[in-house]
UniProtKB/Swiss-Prot annotation:
The lineage of its organism: Eukaryota, Metazoa, Chordata, Craniata, Vertebrata. Residues 511-520 have a biased composition (Basic and acidic residues). It comes from Homo sapiens. This is Oxysterol-binding protein-related protein 10. Interacts with OSBPL9. Interacts with DIAPH1. Transmembrane segments: none annotated. Belongs to the OSBP family. One of its GO terms (molecular function) is phospholipid transporter activity. The gene is OSBPL10. CDD domains: PH_ORP10_ORP11 (cd13291). Keywords: Coiled coil, Cytoplasm, Cytoskeleton, Lipid biosynthesis, Lipid metabolism, Lipid transport, Lipid-binding, Methylation, Phosphoprotein, Transport.
Length: 764
């Protein structure tokens, strides 16, 4: 069949980019046009390009009927992209060809070698194409068999074009494979070995020899009687395939059992990296084969009964993938302890719950603020504040590898129970309280003389709040709060430390805790309460108020974690509202995302994303951007901010620096101010002793887990955590049987948000 090419830029134009732009060679419509119309169906090879051919911008290929039958044909997308090869060679330019009809992405060393054997081929059926912030204009293509291409385009436009075409191709072939239906004319579905070119026409495919090696042809016949005969014939063959797969499944189970029966120490253990990879690969292979068998069964069934939908008949064989030890227990939400030299770590994917099987306790008491007013019982917090700055130990790395082998890219980790050794010795609710470690800056907001000064004070406080809440650079995960869990504390701030921004004269201070005032009458009291109000989704609420300064903060946060390969991302969905009752102002703010990087070596944390601060009454707003570190070069923990007066479109303040280091503020009058977060005074929380805390207060609830983590006894900590989880499951089942809805103790749902039951703005 004739293949023709049509250029669109006069035949001799060139792309101004240093790297050649992606181009589509076509005898038909452009990729964008054709994909919008009817999806990908066939490929037009690049041919007849004199002197390298025309260089057209993406999507600019003209549409014209092909010679011969007038049938519109889809182009093959070609162009130069940078591919990440290895750690030593880094990024290298390679010539890529996207074959729409075959559904493959292949690359060559350069354009001249594209008629030779490709250097690499990636099947796009069922592939995932995602964007990445590791490098500029980067995209990652993950095939269904686990292979991966890390690619970079010349610019954002080219990147988006490639992403669009790759995703469309992947979607098209996935739909064709899973939703194939018999057409009105006879056609064949041919399964060829990997890499075999499928150039035969539909007619020639029907006459392929049955004995041809490596070729299996399933023919959809026009005659219903012939279709029924073929169905009976192939159904019997599929029965044989199913029996064979059942045998392989049993062998794979034996393999997994043999691996997991190995001793916990010695030259070969159950956590050997090669054995973990073997387990994961064998399970994934069986799963893929099972999907293929299901597709074949649907095709045979549809050939005989074209009017019925796939799966409508009970005669279709059922095989749902490998039921290996690991896979089966993952689905059931249970997995036995993994042998380890120093720890028995239990983790499981839970059906409808967050990390610690967030479940309910018996119905709480009616809303009551009694625990907030018992401030005479509170004492200065003397808990250890720093996590041990150690990397991942070898046996722990093996456990994490085992965990990663069971996860999929983009998987929601709120449904995964993580190993105990990665947990931080505090609850997420307490971590929110630690964001208030500089209460003097918070209370100074209301002391501002003008709306401009107050919004700038809030931005200063906001940017300095995160470093203490993170407790060092080591990325560890706080306990996921259990529904009904609460945390209470307070701060005493000397009144002479709370001053407006322009008049505040801060002498150099150490980063040690700031001493409390001896006379309570000379201090402001800042109270804090947090509660876990929901477990699906996991929503935490916290409320903070200073009655004397008539200031309060009400916040609700939904944490959503996601697996990103060698890192974990946590989105903080929700918002907070700072109310200055003295001025009648409300500042609505959002929170950044957090990322745990290098989870297999020395994990570290960074913040990322764009957040906003808005005050509708005054017209002031602020935009804060937490910059994540680029793949190559760049600084970590960088943040920039801009405060704007919207009615006049005037920028009144800019800030830049590091959220856990030095921040520099520049005001519109030319003044500058530098804040070093490492030298800011830290005010310790005041918290009641454990013996005076309720059973659902964070430290009392997790006390045994925390104690064993401090002792380094991971086995005992895991056992205590498991005991706590099981207790919550029992209470949850009771609540479900009684159909009793959970009623939070301190917060009330209003619309999509949650509000403290007795806030300062309602009491005054």
């Amino acid at each position: 069949m004739e293949r023709a090419v049509q250029g669109t830029d006069g035949g001799g134009g060139s792309n101004s980019s240093s790297r050649s732009s992606s181009r589509a060679t076509s005898a038909g419509s452009s990729p964008s046009c054709s994909l919008a119309g009817r999806g990908v169906s066939s490929r037009s090879a690049a041919a007849g390009l004199g002197g390298g051919g025309s260089r057209s911008s993406p999507g600019s290929v003209a549409a014209s009927p092909s010679g011969g039958g007038g049938r519109r044909r889809e182009p093959a997308l070609e162009g130069v992209l940078s591919k990440y090869t290895n750690l030593l060679q880094g990024w290298q330019n390679r010539y890529f060809v996207l074959d729409f009809e075959a559904g493959i992405l292949q690359y060559f060393v350069n354009e001249q070698s594209k008629h030779q054997k490709p250097r690499g081929v990636l099947s796009l059926s069922g592939a995932i194409v995602s964007l990445s912030d590791e490098a500029p204009h980067m995209l990652v293509v993950y095939s269904a068999n686990g292979e991966m291409f890390k690619l970079r385009a010349a610019d954002a436009k080219e990147k988006q074009f490639w992403v669009t075409q790759l995703r469309a191709c992947a979607k098209y072939h996935m739909e064709m494979n899973s939703k194939s239906a018999p057409s009105s004319r006879s056609r064949s579905l041919t399964l060829l070995p990997h890499g075999t070119p499928n150039s035969a026409s539909p007619c020639s495919q029907r006459h392929l020899s049955v004995g041809a090696p490596g070729v299996v042809t399933i023919t959809h016949h026009k005659s219903p009687a012939a279709a029924r005969r073929a169905k009976s014939q192939y159904s019997g063959q599929l029965h044989e395939v199913r029996e064979m797969m059942n045998q392989v499944e049993g062998q794979q189970k034996n393999l997994v059992h043999a691996i997991e029966s190995l001793p916990g120490s010695g030259p070969l253990t159950a956590l050997d990296q090669d054995l973990l990879l073997l387990k994961a690969t064998s399970a994934a292979t069986l799963s893929c084969l099972g999907e293929c068998l299901n597709l074949l069964q649907q095709s045979v069934h549809q050939a005989g009964q074209p009017s019925q939908k796939p799966g409508a008949s009970e005669n279709i064989l059922g095989w749902h993938g490998s039921k290996s030890h690991s896979t089966e227990q993952l689905k059931n939400g249970t997995l036995g302890s993994l042998p380890s030299a120093s720890a028995n770590i239990t983790w499981a994917i839970l059906p409808n719950s967050a990390e610690d099987e967030q479940t309910s306790q018996p119905e709480p008491e009616p809303n009551s603020g009694s625990e907030l007013v018992l401030s005479e019982d509170e004492k200065s917090d003397n808990e250890d504040k720093e996590e041990t700055e150690l990397g991942v130990m070898e046996d722990q790395r093996s456990i994490i590898l085992h965990l990663i082998s069971q996860l999929k890219l983009g998987m929601d980790l709120t449904k995964v129970v993580l190993p105990t050794f990665i947990l931080e010795k505090r609850s997420l609710l307490e971590m929110y309280a630690d964001f208030m470690a500089h209460p003097d800056l918070l209370l100074a907001i209301t002391a501002g003389a003008t709306p401009e000064e107050r919004v700038i004070c809030f931005v200063e406080y906001y940017l300095t709040a995160f470093h203490e809440g993170r407790k060092g650079a080591l990325a560890k995960k706080p306990y996921n709060p259990i529904i009904g869990e609460t945390f209470h504390c307070s701060w005493e701030v000397p009144k002479d430390r709370v001053k407006p921004k322009r008049t505040a004269s801060r002498s150099p201070a150490s980063c040690h805790e700031h001493p409390m005032a001896d006379d309570p009458s000379k201090s402001y009291k800042l109270r804090f309460v947090a509660e876990q109000v929901s477990h699906h989704p996991p929503i935490s609420c916290f409320y903070c108020e200073c009655e004397e300064k008539r200031l309060c903060v009400n916040t609700h946060v939904w944490t959503k974690s996601k697996f990103m390969g060698m890192s974990v991302g946590v989105s903080m969905i929700g918002e907070g509202v700072l109310r200055l009752l003295e001025h009648g102002e409300e500042y609505v703010f959002t929170l950044p995302s957090a990322y745990a990087r290098s989870i297999l070596t020395i994990p570290w944390v960074e913040l990322g994303g764009k957040v906003s601060i808005n005050c509708a009454k005054t017209g002031y707003s602020a935009t804060v951007i937490f910059h994540t570190k680029p793949f190559y070069g760049g600084k970590v923990h960088r943040v920039t901010a801009e405060v704007k007066h919207n009615p006049t479109n005037t920028i009144v303040c800019k800030a830049h620096g590091e959220w856990n280091g030095t921040l520099e503020f520049t005001y519109n009058n030319g003044e500058t101010k530098v804040i070093d977060t490492t030298t800011l005074p830290v005010y310790p929380k005041k918290i009641r002793p454990l013996e005076k805390q309720g059973p659902m207060e964070s430290r009392n609830l997790w006390r045994e887990v925390t104690r064993y983590l401090r002792l380094g006894d991971i086995d005992a900590a895991t056992e205590q955590k498991r005991h706590l989880e099981e207790k919550q499951r029992v209470e949850e089942r009771k609540r479900e049987n009684l159909r009793t809805p959970w009623k939070p103790k301190y917060f009330i749902q209003e619309g999509d948000g949650w509000v403290y039951f007795n806030p300062l703005w309602k009491a005054h």
